Amino acid sequence: MPVLKQLGPAQPKKRPDRGALSISAPLGDFRHTLHVGRGGDAFGDTSFLSRHGGGPPPEPRAPPAGAPRSPPPPAVPQSAAPSPADPLLSFHLDLGPSMLDAVLGVMDAARPEAAAAKPDAEPRPGTQPPQARCRPNADLELNDVIGL
């Protein structure tokens, strides 16, 4: 198996040093008061989170021992549709008008008899609707239409 050699300069480029003029001075419009670590742990001033509704919900307290128990709230039914936030569960391919027109044009070119006779909205009783056929030696190739 051949060994691939990386092409490039023999000497690696040296990164330029950052000078005092390349970093701007603090503008005074930002205060660093909070830090979030890699594990999600946060420390510092988190009071702004409570003003924006981003705080965690309060933990439920255990009722006193002598208090009667109330029935649990009804469960919220979950929809069977995938969440739009999960791109792996939904797949949507938009070819756009130009790509779709090109593909449909190639398919129509493969059926010259279909261009002459447009099918009715409903087929007549006792007749079969026309079947789509593709010829292997069509005049237009899909790669030519889309520019490959």
Swiss-Prot record:
Residues 23-37 form the CRIB domain. The modification Omega-N-methylarginine is found at R38. It holds the Pfam family BORG_CEP. Keywords: Cell shape, Cytoplasm, Cytoskeleton, Membrane, Methylation. One of its GO terms (cellular component) is endomembrane system. Interacts with CDC42, in a GTP-dependent manner, and with SEPT7. The CRIB domain mediates interaction with CDC42. Probably involved in the organization of the actin cytoskeleton. May act downstream of CDC42 to induce actin filament assembly leading to cell shape changes. Induces pseudopodia formation in fibroblasts. Inhibits MAPK8 independently of CDC42 binding. Controls septin organization and this effect is negatively regulated by CDC42. This is Cdc42 effector protein 5. It comes from Homo sapiens. The lineage of its organism: Eukaryota, Metazoa, Chordata, Craniata, Vertebrata.
